[in-house]
Design a protein with these regions (language model features):
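Alpha-helical elements of Rossmann-like donor-binding domains used by nucleotide-donor carbohydrate transfer enzymes
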Residues: 22-26, 52-56, 73, 97, ...
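Substrate-recognition element of Asp-dependent hydrolases with the DxDx(T/V) motif
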Residues: 95-125, 179
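N-terminal helical cap/lid subdomain that shapes the substrate entry/recognition surface
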Residues: 2-93
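Short phosphate-binding/catalytic loops that engage adenosine nucleotides
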Residues: 62, 107, 184-185
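Conserved SAM-binding loop
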Residues: 13, 109, 168-169
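Asp-based, Mg2+/Mn2+-dependent phosphohydrolase catalytic module
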Residues: 1-3, 117, 122-216
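Short beta->alpha linker loops
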Residues: 19, 45-48, 90-94, 115, ...
Length: 216
């Protein structure tokens, strides 16, 4: 029985991958004078905290100041690109109805995101997330988390629910693997990357959806 739900955000509740790719591309050109390859994107960028991405691009030579500066700059680019594309600046279809359904069932839920605080604040304000969940319970990349596994575990603690009783909703291969390694055995995947057959074979995955209307 599901007692708590943990949502990834980017690519799960909000389809924004193109904006992240565009923003990281700008940073990559600054740091390396080259674009990001598709292989790099899947292996080193998707679902990975900013500090690890910047270390990767700086060959593990990044200082604390480098990480802070380029992380904030990347997210500034990202927010700018989101605002410029108003047509797609909304939550995935069915999201608010699913939030309501969870509320009605008295199932607590939160977000565990690799985004930094400035982005979380941006999402909370833009999508009125405070109407649905405790904003203080949202887990984000504050620089202390080693990986998404630690984020998921902390999110379960915030909900006061054993992670084995949590449903985690993810969209990336690395996110699914991290959810499973964190101890979750009920994982739903939002198929924003159009990889359904691969996701269905992964440990812990119980369902692959295109949007949240499929869970109503």
């Amino acid at each position: 029985m599901v007692k708590g739900v943990i949502f990834d955000f980017n690519g799960t509740l909000f389809f924004d991958n193109d904006k992240h790719v565009k923003a990281w591309g700008a940073i990559s050109r600054l740091l390396r004078n080259k674009d990001i390859t598709d292989e790099e994107l899947h292996k080193h960028f998707n679902g990975v905290p900013n500090q690890k991405i910047i270390q990767y691009m700086k060959n593990n030579q990044a200082t604390k100041e480098d990480i802070e500066y380029y992380s904030k700059l990347k997210e500034k680019y990202y927010r700018q690109f989101c605002k410029e594309d108003q047509a797609s600046f909304h939550l995935v279809e069915g999201s608010y109805d699913y939030f309501k359904q969870l509320k009605d069932q008295k199932i607590s839920f939160t977000i565990a995101s690799a985004s930094i605080k400035e982005n979380i604040d941006f999402f909370v304000e833009s999508f009125q997330l405070g109407k649905w969940m405790k904003v203080d319970d949202i887990i984000y990349d504050n620089g202390t988390y080693q990986n998404k596994i630690a984020m998921f575990k902390d999110a379960a603690l915030k909900l006061n629910v054993n992670i084995k009783d949590c449903l985690i909703i993810e969209d990336s291969k690395s996110g699914i693997e991290n959810a499973y390694q964190a101890g979750c055995r009920q994982i739903i995947v939002v198929n924003s990357a159009n990889n359904k057959k691969e996701y269905e074979k992964m440990p812990g995955v119980i369902k692959v959806i295109n949007d949240f209307k499929e869970l109503l």
